[in-house]
A protein has these predicted regions:
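Extracytoplasmic gate region of multi-pass secondary transporters
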Residues: 26-27, 203-245, 249-256
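Helix-breaking motifs and short loop linkers at transmembrane-helix boundaries and internal kinks
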Residues: 38, 70, 90-96, 234, ...
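Conserved MFS/SLC helix-loop-helix module at the cytosolic interface between two early adjacent transmembrane helices
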Residues: 57-94
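Helix-to-loop junctions at the C-terminal end of transmembrane segments
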Residues: 58-70, 255-269
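Cytoplasmic helix-loop-helix junction between adjacent transmembrane helices
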Residues: 99-142
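Helix-loop-helix hairpin linking two adjacent transmembrane segments in secondary transporters
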Residues: 127, 135-183
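C-terminal transmembrane helical hairpin of 12-TM major facilitator-type secondary transporters
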Residues: 270-317
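A late C-terminal transmembrane helix in Major Facilitator Superfamily
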Residues: 323-362, 369
Length: 388
């Protein structure tokens, strides 16, 4: 039983890492695309926006497909599509085709959250589900780090498309491995999700609202860390990149630790998972108020490490909590809805933070994120105190 658990979690985590290597290659390669096609900063922004729109547009449809056809099919096809998408970016002869490829790439990444969550909750014993979610959620930051090394590292040795092509090869290899290896992992066919039930589930809707706040916090923090360290602390861009790496590393640690606590603490699953999630988000809210007090790179590194552990580390338990308040047959669609909310938060959070920073200062921006964290805590507490 223990061997099967680690085999399954390792397989799902490997899938998540490979998918993230393909998806985040675009973020790592923005400067390469700029130089290759002579893009302006606005045009580079369009690439990222198109990628994100593709992701957001297909989250719910792919969540439905996962509930209907099973995660083995959707995750295998999804990773194959990601590999093709990142390869098309490398092969695109014009900027317009880069945008088409970016949209395709983003759309296939939409299967990641509903598919991997369903794989965990359908096949892992309830006593170990939350730490399994925490472990597989290490995939995005690890995949992002790997793609950064591939895309920016190989350009000086080979050609600018090399990193994208290697990412595509990784995606193809892992997609094949996953399709073969997951066959005996206990996948099952599911019926169409109960949308009426989800819309009538007060706890789920409150968590979706909380996810919007947490998503805004996550995307804004990761997007502005390097810039803040450079402009406010006065450190070099490379130092800001190091602080960002620390933030991501502690984010991974926070997800694993929170998942473990969600499994081993006493009490009902709803109570212990919701409580740990509340503590993480509240801790993040307090820490955001301390960011302006950091005056050296070391102090910034410490504060952002703690932010990773608390604010960004809450991602895993957020999906765990969603799985508790919905039925098993609806986990794929419910997870997709939660991720859609987080992505929506990522669309409005950074511009709002930027506006506050320009008009008032960074302190106002960090207080804004702290307020969103506290709002998320309030919504989670309402779910804890209420019932479906």
């Amino acid at each position: 039983m223990r061997t099967r658990y680690w085999r399954l979690v390792s397989l799902i985590t490997t899938w998540h890492v490979a998918a993230s290597v393909c998806y985040y290659a675009v973020f790592a390669g923005t400067t390469l695309l700029r130089d290759a096609f002579g893009l302006s900063p606005v045009s580079v922004g369009f690439v990222v926006t198109t990628l994100t729109l593709g992701y957001a547009a297909f989250l719910l449809p792919l969540g439905v497909a996962t509930d209907r056809f099973g995660e083995r099919r959707t995750l295998s096809v999804g990773l194959l599509g990601l590999a093709v998408g990142v390869a098309l970016i490398a092969a695109a002869p014009t900027f317009e085709l880069v945008l088409v490829a970016a949209f395709l790439l983003g759309s296939f990444y939409g299967v990641a959250t509903p598919g991997t969550n369903k794989a965990i909750f359908d096949n892992v014993d309830p006593s170990r589900q939350h730490r399994a979610i925490g472990l597989k959620q290490v995939g995005p930051p690890l995949g992002s780090a790997i793609s950064s090394v591939l895309v920016t590292g190989l350009v000086g040795v080979l050609f600018w498309q090399a990193g994208f092509l290697v990412a595509a090869a990784v995606g193809l290899a892992v997609a094949s491995l996953f399709y073969v290896a997951y066959a005996g992992a206990g996948a099952s066919e599911a019926a169409y999700p109960d949308f009426r039930g989800l819309l009538g589930n007060r706890s789920y809707l409150l968590l979706v609202a909380a996810g919007t706040c947490l998503g805004a916090v996550f995307y804004t923090t990761t997007g502005y860390t390097v810039l803040y360290v450079e402009e406010s602390i006065g450190a070099a861009v490379a130092v800001g990149g190091l602080v960002l790496a620390v933030l991501q590393a502690f984010s991974s640690a926070g997800r694993v630790l929170a998942g473990w606590l969600g499994d081993v603490l006493p009490g009902e699953p709803r109570t212990r998972v919701g409580s740990v999630l509340s503590v993480q988000a509240l801790g993040g809210g307090v820490l955001f108020l301390l960011v302006p007090a950091a005056s050296t790179p070391l102090e910034a590194g410490v504060v952002f490490a703690l932010l990773g552990l608390f604010a960004l580390g809450s991602v895993g338990l957020y999906y765990s909590f969603i799985s508790i308040v919905v039925s098993e047959d609806d986990i794929g669609s419910a997870s997709a809805g939660g991720q859609f909310a987080a992505t929506f938060g990522g669309l409005f959070g950074p511009p709002a933070f930027g506006y506050l920073t320009e008009s008032i200062g960074y302190g106002a921006g960090w207080r804004f994120l702290g307020g969103l964290s506290v709002l998320a805590v309030g919504l989670v507490i309402v779910v804890l105190l209420g019932s479906r």
